[in-house]
């Protein structure tokens, strides 16, 4: 996947959602008008190959590598029988603290990035993401910029492609399907991460703006909208 950027026109848009089926604790509501100036955004999330180039050029050591551990989803450990679990998240016990887990060894010590060069880099902290962005000549987007970009020019649609999750039976993103957190039917073709260009882009030509991995923004989370 070749790195390239997309120029976005910016302008006013409605940020947030009042969708009743969402999670109130996410603080996405109420809907409010926001203006963003024109900006550029990479068409794809940062891949393992791209992050490897950054590390090779700078010698950067990620937060997870410094801590010698990171959190791995429980189902992913089946591929790494030798993984050593150190702890779990009390409120979300499917997230396990695994020794040696990092961007280079996503499932812990002994795991590799084999055949995942075009997958998004994971186990990347906010500081890691900021360092990569600066190295690549950019910066992390604000939450407003990110949401504007993710919407792809649509007004208050549920997804970057519209209001229907699988229009015409077509899967549009890589997300958990089945009984969370024990059974993922992988109906979209991917049990965990997938190549960043596995699904069609949104209306702005941006890929993986829903599903696949969580993404960082520049600003802090809050619910005091002014």
Describe the role of every protein-language-model region.
Residues 47:
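Acidic-aromatic/histidine active-site loop/patch
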Residues 7-8, 14, 18-19, 24, ...:
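Functional-site microenvironments in short loops/helix caps that host divalent-cation chemistry
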Residues 57-58:
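Non-catalytic, well-ordered alpha-helical segments in soluble enzyme domains
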Residues 31-33, 38:
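Well-ordered beta-strand positions in beta-sheet-rich domains
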